[in-house]
């Protein structure tokens, strides 16, 4: 039986989020609705999640000493990584010492903090189908990997980055140096290391939200949400929809792959498993041990959205992955480089039938920074996609003055 305390009292159940962007913000709201005391941590002040948490803390999360000091001072029951750029070896040390429980596990946080750990686990340890790949530490190694079998076209990504930063497609030899330079500029931390992948001519790509939670028997069970289709531009999601129609054999393969990788990572919580699909064939791409940006669509489509599923699972509560309605999401970009932007057209966006708008509250806007998302539901995904994109297009961030 799960027992929850009262926030801001000696009985409080305390959860610390490491990373407090738009996804963390929704997790924090879901936790607060269950009476959890929340601590939002980020590298900058007034991050979206910090605006709604009981406590806001700002540190360099990649600094092991700062991370250790904060966890020991706050004494949370659970630490929930929401980004990759964290001192994960320190989390492993603290978890091994019994200081804190890391979600889903400290090992999972370490393996998924960069593309190398999780790709080697999936392809080499678990034998899951993936694109051909090589890891490279220099421009010369990158060229040799391409010439040695990866071939063109191919995709180059920093081993650590998010939201498509530093990712590009190479169509021929003339693009190799530019791709290397772009990857070096776009990495989350200065690793100087990339993965180059052979290009898979897939029909579509999906995110399969996979939940490990305690079932009625008291044992950990794996549940799947309906597959989410999405469109990416330069590796960054711009729209998603649910459910993505799939051949039954492809869906079964996707679920087997997701089950295998999440079972190995262990722990409890929601995982975003990214997969490529062509006909009945499925290839593993990536996994995040936390809610996924493409999964924001579940705020319009599921009885329990991905953030509520994550919150419930990590607290040992029952989960329900049932689809409520077809729906879609479309990103609202900043469009301008400014602090404290204002948003015109929200009223017009909400006049689109069966839509909602979420503005993240980020203190600073960039041209390609996600500042919000439009959500829509309908009787079919095509109508929902049209509505979401129309609503998003009506919201116009602008600089003040």
Swiss-Prot record:
Q: Which residues form the ATP-grasp domain?
A: 120-315
Where along this sequence does the record place binding of ATP?
Answer: 115, 157, 162-167, 197-200, 205
Pfam families named among the record's database cross-references: ATP-grasp, PurT_C, RS_preATP-grasp-like
GO MF annotation, one: phosphoribosylglycinamide formyltransferase activity
One GO CC term, this protein:
cytosol
**Annotated disulfide bonds:** none
Q: Which InterPro entries match?
A: ATP-grasp, ATP-grasp_carboxylate-amine, ATP_grasp_subdomain_1, PreATP-grasp_dom_sf, PurT, PurT/PurK_preATP-grasp, PurT_C, Rudment_hybrid_motif
Q: Which reaction does it catalyse?
A: N(1)-(5-phospho-beta-D-ribosyl)glycinamide + formate + ATP = N(2)-formyl-N(1)-(5-phospho-beta-D-ribosyl)glycinamide + ADP + phosphate + H(+)
Which pathway does this chain act in? Answer: Purine metabolism; IMP biosynthesis via de novo pathway; N(2)-formyl-N(1)-(5-phospho-D-ribosyl)glycinamide from N(1)-(5-phospho-D-ribosyl)glycinamide (formate route): step 1/1
**Which residues of the sequence carry a binding annotation for Mg(2+)?**
274, 286
Q: What is its EC number?
A: 6.3.1.21
**Top-level taxon:** Bacteria
* Annotated residues for binding of N(1)-(5-phospho-beta-D-ribosyl)glycinamide: 22-23, 82, 293, 362, 369-370
Q: Name one GO biological process term.
A: 'de novo' IMP biosynthetic process
**Entry's family note:** Belongs to the PurK/PurT family.
Q: How does it assemble?
A: Homodimer.
Q: Which HAMAP family match?
A: PurT
The record describes the protein's role as: Involved in the de novo purine biosynthesis. Catalyzes the transfer of formate to 5-phospho-ribosyl-glycinamide (GAR), producing 5-phospho-ribosyl-N-formylglycinamide (FGAR). Formate is provided by PurU via hydrolysis of 10-formyl-tetrahydrofolate.
Under which name does UniProt file this protein?
A: Formate-dependent phosphoribosylglycinamide formyltransferase
Lineage of producing organism: Bacteria, Pseudomonadati, Pseudomonadota, Betaproteobacteria, Burkholderiales
């Amino acid at each position: 039986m799960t027992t929850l305390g009262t926030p801001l009292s000696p009985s409080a159940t305390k959860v610390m989020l490491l990373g407090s962007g738009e996804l963390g913000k929704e997790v924090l709201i879901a936790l607060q609705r269950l009476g959890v005391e929340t601590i939002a941590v980020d590298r900058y002040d007034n991050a979206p999640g910090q605006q709604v948490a009981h406590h806001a803390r700002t540190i360099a999360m990649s600094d092991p000493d700062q991370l250790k000091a904060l966890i020991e001072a706050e004494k949370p029951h659970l630490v929930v990584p929401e980004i990759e750029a964290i001192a994960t070896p320190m989390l492993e040390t603290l978890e091994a010492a019994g200081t804190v429980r890391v979600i889903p596990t400290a090992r999972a946080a370490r393996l998924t903090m960069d593309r190398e750990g999780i790709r080697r686990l999936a392809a080499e340890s678990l034998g899951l189908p993936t694109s051909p790949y090589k890891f490279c530490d220099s421009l010369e190694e990158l060229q040799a990997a391409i010439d040695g079998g990866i071939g063109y076209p191919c995709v180059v990504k920093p081993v650590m980055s998010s939201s498509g930063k530093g990712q590009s497609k190479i169509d021929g030899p003339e693009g190799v140096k530019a791709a290397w330079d772009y990857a070096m500029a776009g990495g989350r931390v200065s690793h100087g290391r990339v993965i180059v992948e052979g290009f898979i001519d897939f029909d579509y790509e999906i995110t399969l939200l996979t939940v490990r939670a305690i079932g009625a028997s008291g044992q950990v069970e794996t549940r799947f949400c309906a597959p989410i289709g999405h469109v990416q531009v330069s590796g960054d999601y711009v729209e998603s929809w649910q459910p993505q129609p799939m051949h039954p054999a492809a869906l079964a393969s996707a679920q087997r792959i997701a089950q295998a990788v999440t079972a190995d990572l262990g722990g409890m919580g929601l995982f975003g498993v990214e997969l490529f699909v062509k006909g009945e064939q499925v290839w593993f791409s990536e996994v995040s041990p936390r809610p996924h940006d493409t999964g924001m669509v579940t705020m319009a489509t599921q009885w329990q959205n991905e953030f509520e599923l994550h919150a419930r699972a990590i607290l040992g509560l029952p989960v329900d992955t049932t689809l409520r309605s077809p729906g879609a999401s479309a990103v609202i970009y900043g469009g301008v480089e400014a602090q404290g932007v204002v948003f015109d057209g929200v009223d017009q966006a909400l006049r689109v039938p069966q839509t909602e708008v979420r503005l993240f509250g980020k203190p600073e806007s960039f041209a390609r920074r996600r500042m919000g998302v439009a959500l829509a539901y309908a009787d079919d995904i095509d109508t929902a996609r049209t509505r979401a994109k129309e609503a998003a297009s009506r919201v116009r961030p602008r600089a003040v003055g």
